[in-house]
Amino acid sequence: MPVAAIIEERLSQQNSVFGISEAVASDGHFGDVKTTIFQDQHGKLQALYSGDSILDVEALCRLTQRQLSVVSPAAIGSICDQLTLERLTTIPTVLGLELIVDQRLLDTTELTLDSGSKHYVITINNEQFRNLIGDAQTGTYTVLESELVTSSLE
């Protein structure tokens, strides 16, 4: 498989049905799911959200009742190195961090996830995605980019 062993292992553990395709960058990210890693005194948290949205950090802090800050690029590099990933993956639970998922992702029928490889993305359906996130916290903590553009023009 053209993706990291940890990705293959995680998908196999869940008996996930998925497709692999060549990655094409859009606005600097791969796939239609973005991720940001945060931390506070309780540890690290991975937030997954839709690629057409902007993360609202204040809403995320209210939702989680935590005082979160973004982890450093060096810490992200360390996470990727430990897992032999070329960049952060958006495949749920691979990073081994507490996970929160934006509601918009759960309303999507199919998702394209960053495999953590420079060259490939993973496509899964909503049911498979829900299986992968397990009992992760969910909520709304993003704003659609299109809503911001429309609001600023009015």
List each language-model region with its residue ranges.
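Extended, low-hydrophobicity, polar/charged segments
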Residues: 1-154
